[in-house]
A protein has these predicted regions:
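Rossmann-fold dinucleotide-binding core
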Residues: 4, 96-179
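Helical "substrate-binding/catalytic lid" subdomain
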Residues: 166-285
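NAD(P)+-binding Rossmann beta1-loop-alpha1 motif at the extreme N-terminus of oxidoreductases
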Residues: 1-65, 88, 124, 156
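Hydrophobic beta-strand scaffold residues
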Residues: 27, 49, 115-116, 157, ...
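Rossmann-fold NAD(P) dinucleotide-binding segment
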Residues: 53-114
Length: 287
């Protein structure tokens, strides 16, 4: 029976361990707060709670991590330098920054350890069920070797190319989008409060209108650089943002996301781009 180590037994780590057990793996688990790993072991004889990281990785075919950030990953892994056998697998599911991820993979590769970054778009329930999306990048041979095992952990395994840091970048792209949506919903709630409409009532709009369906089209418009003919003129979009800010102010509310977008459109209009599609206002200069 295959044994893996799992370092970090928070909500996602716990879900991943449950999935590993459902897939017939035995797990050696470690967590900085030992009680969490001990609770998992107490409910499942196939999980061993280990007091130290070194104990957890001993005899494991793969070492998986689900921690909080780059600093926590390095704090856990670096003491293992020189202790892991050549050819050991380290699979990091932590959301980390792009450059530190590239440096970490290079550092461990130089030590003879096969280190791969595989962040996820998976809630704890997805981790337990093996659904959602897992990203992976780096050496194609490593991807091919890991694919059967990682595919059992997720609904879709997405390979993003040979640069080891690409998965980290794409995870940040996705989380930026998700968090940006939350910011927009916050502004919708503030605008609703300003005009005397209950937030739940305002959000009922999205039972009929799904603005997310326009996201691929809008992204393509921005990246293509084709801003004519416009589907939504920048000057008209800026007018709508003005209406939103004015209504919010009348109701004693201040919008959070709208002012930043308004600033970008003001800059575009100042460049004489008011008749172009609004996508021109958010493009990256020189990109």
């Amino acid at each position: 029976m295959t044994t893996i180590a799992f370092l970090g037994t928070g909500l996602m780590g716990t879900g991943f361990i449950q999935r590993a057990r459902a897939n017939g793996l035995t797990v050696r688990a470690w967590n900085r707060s030992a009680a969490k790993a001990q609770a998992l072991a107490g409910n499942d004889a196939g999980v061993t709670a280990c007091a130290t990281v070194a104990e957890a990785v001993r005899g494991a075919e793969r070492i998986h991590l689900s921690l909080s950030d780059d600093a926590s990953v390095d704090a856990v892994l670096e003491p293992l330098a020189g202790a892991l056998p050549a050819g050991a697998w380290v699979v990091d599911h932590t959301t980390t920054a792009v450059r530190p991820t590239a440096e970490r993979v290079a550092r461990w590769t130089a030590r003879g350890v096969r280190c791969v970054h595989a962040p996820v778009f998976m809630a704890p329930a997805n981790c337990a069920e093996g659904t959602g999306w897992m990203l992976i990048s780096g050496d194609p041979a490593r991807h091919q070797a890991l694919q059967p095992a990682l595919q059992l952990m997720t609904g879709s395994l997405v390979y993003l190319g040979p640069q080891p840091e690409r998965a980290a970048a794409f995870k940040l792209f996705g989380n930026l989008t998700l968090l940006g949506i939350l910011g927009v919903l916050g502004d919708v709630g503030r605008l609703a409060a300003a005009v005397g409409i209950d937030m739940k009532d305002a959000f009922s709009l999205f039972e009929h209108f799904n603005p997310g369906q326009t996201l691929p089209q809008r992204a393509k418009r921005i990246s293509s650089g084709q801003y004519t003919p416009p589907s939504f003129e920048m000057s008209m979009a800026r007018k709508d943002l003005r209406l939103m800010e004015e209504e919010a102010a009348r109701g004693g509310q201040t919008l959070a996301m709208v002012p930043a977008l308004a600033k970008l459109l003001d800059e575009g209009i100042a460049r004489g781009e008011g008749q172009l599609d609004v996508a021109a206002g958010v493009r990256v200069p020189g990109a």
